[in-house]
Amino acid sequence: MDVSYLLDSLNDKQREAVAAPRSNLLVLAGAGSGKTRVLVHRIAWLMSVENCSPYSIMAVTFTNKAAAEMRHRIGQLMGTSQGGMWVGTFHGLAHRLLRAHHMDANLPQDFQILDSEDQLRLLKRLIKAMNLDEKQWPPRQAMWYINSQKDEGLRPHHIQSYGNPVEQTWQKVYQAYQEACDRAGLVDFAELLLRAHELWLNKPHILQHYRERFTNILVDEFQDTNNIQYAWIRLLAGDTGKVMIVGDDDQSIYGWRGAQVENIQRFLNDFPGAETIRLEQNYRSTSNILSAANALIENNNGRLGKKLWTDGADGEPISLYCAFNELDEARFVVNRIKTWQDNGGALAECAILYRSNAQSRVLEEALLQASMPYRIYGGMRFFERQEIKDALSYLRLIANRNDDAAFERVVNTPTRGIGDRTLDVVRQTSRDRQLTLWQACRELLQEKALAGRAASALQRFMELIDALAQETADMPLHVQTDRVIKDSGLRTMYEQEKGEKGQTRIENLEELVTATRQFSYNEEDEDLMPLQAFLSHAALEAGEGQADTWQDAVQLMTLHSAKGLEFPQVFIVGMEEGMFPSQMSLDEGGRLEEERRLAYVGVTRAMQKLTLTYAETRRLYGKEVYHRPSRFIGELPEECVEEVRLRATVSRPVSHQRMGTPMVENDSGYKLGQRVRHAKFGEGTIVNMEGSGEHSRLQVAFQGQGIKWLVAAYARLESV
């Protein structure tokens, strides 16, 4: 039988992996080394050469998209339908298993999957029913606790509290939650895996059936597996199943959600005699980019070891740009993308990667100013994020009590005991009397028409809004915003949300404070109060909408979201200590190596051109900070990196200019370094200029007001 079509398009190491004998196998697949192709061709090899039935093959991926692509490529390669093969995610395959054996798993036939939002709502009700203070026992923290225990394979009765009252309370919440789910026939995502694992443990005949069936098991992205997923595969394989895992210890970046890079080493220990094949030839990046990636990751300890290489060109050196602040950084990136576009490149070929979602705001504004369409990959635009919309709704209600949409969003956020029944009365009164919701509340309270506890909670909420409006009216906008975020309870609510997600929400709220501080009026906003002008600005930015899916657009995403993707031109911004690596990774032991792996992932996304940027000073989370350049920059080979020098037309703050540097002047009549006075913002120094004539724009560093961009024709600046 001619099987050359399975091997001809592969390199030597890929062929070795595809045609390996049926035994346990680790394929250590470097970034861009063609691992999906190897998996697909291996499955085809098993069927065509080893005469394995599709019925005997299970292939596990981490996303539904990857599973669909694998099925499609197998079908294309084999030319026939592969019925009987199981290809899917861990959760998808566990769900399929539980549907087939629902009675043995003690589930009703029509059991339903509980998504994360439904899970959170159920926990809120249970915590309230248990008479627990939601502030002390946040539902989000309960959800994190329960999911973490399930990922470790633990039921409430397995957990050792050692007399710790906090642990005992969470244990009771977990128990009550599980009982509620069982009564209602509900299964959350973590439960799918745990219940399927328990099914096999408790019903040996079912386990034996699947062991005899699935004698060929293939698992992708093995470095991202958690404890229960590893146990699942280990149990299914038994002593006779043949397992091929594909992974890269250098790309393990999900430790914060339970992934265990150690599972690759566990596999080698638990499956004695397993062979290891390294895929090191890269088909994505230039030699310079790969040299940088190799040098970077070599600083990690305990690696299984591999070195990426390519037979392609050296390519351009990596560009390194030192910006004087985050605004300069954003403009530099946008200008580079514009040059790429002018030279015939597509916007969609450019990706901007950042460590924290909060960094996207300044980049989004720079792209909007340049009329450059963009898309946030795997996330929402800054002003569309939940925590930002919450904060803006408070500000909107302070500015206008009759804003019904804002009222609806925040009246019970954070939870303050105003239930749906009370709000239904308010809504009905609003409709019947043709009042706004705020007015309806006022009348119902005056008439004493609401129940005692609900009336008290509603009264306190209205007093809070009135007090914030009165007490913050004369504050600078950024101080007012910060005060509202704190006094509303939003900051406390999100501080109680465990893990990186909660930290990200806090960072975004602090970045909103920065946005209000940097906000400057447009000409059409001159007659508005600062808060009203900013709310208009925020609404317009949110209303811009993301680029249509068919539209050529710059791609913005976190480094985590970038995994598995590739782009001809990549920018990694915010390469500073405390930004990347993150402050959390510096504060917590054992996190730095995962940050370096994340940097490695970012670098290896670039195909042709990689640019790294850092800022000397950055207004971050409401305050000015000075960070050292990231240690990751210093770990790159000097011969691979080229520092971008500032042109004469790009200015740095006066404090950073060398003595004797001539001032730059444009036809607006203003000069760099010139001291000026603005009627609203006070005195400041011109630190940058762009455009000419009536379109000239000035960047002015104002004392106590921060750095602002102004249109020269409308700014009415006086020379000091």
From Swiss-Prot:
<dbReference type="InterPro" id="IPR014017">
    <property type="entry name" value="DNA_helicase_UvrD-like_C"/>
</dbReference>
<dbReference type="GO" id="GO:0042803">
    <property type="term" value="F:protein homodimerization activity"/>
</dbReference>
<dbReference type="GO" id="GO:0003678">
    <property type="term" value="F:DNA helicase activity"/>
</dbReference>
<feature type="binding site">
    <location>
        <begin position="32"/>
        <end position="37"/>
    </location>
    <ligand>
        <name>ATP</name>
    </ligand>
</feature>
<comment type="function">
    <text>A helicase with DNA-dependent ATPase activity. Unwinds DNA duplexes with 3'-5' polarity. Translocates on single-stranded DNA with 3'-5' polarity. Initiates unwinding more efficiently from a nicked substrate than double-stranded DNA. Involved in the post-incision events of nucleotide excision repair and methyl-directed mismatch repair, and probably also in repair of alkylated DNA.</text>
</comment>
<keyword id="KW-0547">Nucleotide-binding</keyword>
<dbReference type="GO" id="GO:0070581">
    <property type="term" value="P:rolling circle DNA replication"/>
</dbReference>
<dbReference type="GO" id="GO:0006289">
    <property type="term" value="P:nucleotide-excision repair"/>
</dbReference>
<keyword id="KW-0235">DNA replication</keyword>
<dbReference type="GO" id="GO:0033202">
    <property type="term" value="C:DNA helicase complex"/>
</dbReference>
<keyword id="KW-0227">DNA damage</keyword>
<dbReference type="InterPro" id="IPR027417">
    <property type="entry name" value="P-loop_NTPase"/>
</dbReference>
<dbReference type="GO" id="GO:0070716">
    <property type="term" value="P:mismatch repair involved in maintenance of fidelity involved in DNA-dependent DNA replication"/>
</dbReference>
<dbReference type="GO" id="GO:0009432">
    <property type="term" value="P:SOS response"/>
</dbReference>
<feature type="domain" description="UvrD-like helicase C-terminal">
    <location>
        <begin position="287"/>
        <end position="564"/>
    </location>
</feature>
<dbReference type="GO" id="GO:0015616">
    <property type="term" value="F:DNA translocase activity"/>
</dbReference>
<keyword id="KW-0413">Isomerase</keyword>
<dbReference type="GO" id="GO:0003677">
    <property type="term" value="F:DNA binding"/>
</dbReference>
<dbReference type="GO" id="GO:0031297">
    <property type="term" value="P:replication fork processing"/>
</dbReference>
<dbReference type="InterPro" id="IPR013986">
    <property type="entry name" value="DExx_box_DNA_helicase_dom_sf"/>
</dbReference>
<dbReference type="Pfam" id="PF00580">
    <property type="entry name" value="UvrD-helicase"/>
</dbReference>
<dbReference type="GO" id="GO:0005829">
    <property type="term" value="C:cytosol"/>
</dbReference>
<dbReference type="GO" id="GO:0043138">
    <property type="term" value="F:3'-5' DNA helicase activity"/>
</dbReference>
<keyword id="KW-0234">DNA repair</keyword>
<dbReference type="GO" id="GO:0017117">
    <property type="term" value="C:single-stranded DNA-dependent ATP-dependent DNA helicase complex"/>
</dbReference>
<dbReference type="GO" id="GO:0017116">
    <property type="term" value="F:single-stranded DNA helicase activity"/>
</dbReference>
<feature type="binding site">
    <location>
        <position position="284"/>
    </location>
    <ligand>
        <name>ATP</name>
    </ligand>
</feature>
<dbReference type="GO" id="GO:0000725">
    <property type="term" value="P:recombinational repair"/>
</dbReference>
<dbReference type="GO" id="GO:0016887">
    <property type="term" value="F:ATP hydrolysis activity"/>
</dbReference>
<dbReference type="GO" id="GO:0009314">
    <property type="term" value="P:response to radiation"/>
</dbReference>
<keyword id="KW-0238">DNA-binding</keyword>
<dbReference type="Pfam" id="PF21196">
    <property type="entry name" value="PcrA_UvrD_tudor"/>
</dbReference>
<keyword id="KW-0742">SOS response</keyword>
<dbReference type="InterPro" id="IPR005753">
    <property type="entry name" value="DNA_helicase_ATP-dep_UvrD"/>
</dbReference>
<dbReference type="InterPro" id="IPR014016">
    <property type="entry name" value="UvrD-like_ATP-bd"/>
</dbReference>
<dbReference type="GO" id="GO:0006298">
    <property type="term" value="P:mismatch repair"/>
</dbReference>
<comment type="similarity">
    <text>Belongs to the helicase family. UvrD subfamily.</text>
</comment>
<dbReference type="InterPro" id="IPR000212">
    <property type="entry name" value="DNA_helicase_UvrD/REP"/>
</dbReference>
<keyword id="KW-0347">Helicase</keyword>
<keyword id="KW-0067">ATP-binding</keyword>
<dbReference type="GO" id="GO:0005524">
    <property type="term" value="F:ATP binding"/>
</dbReference>
<keyword id="KW-0378">Hydrolase</keyword>
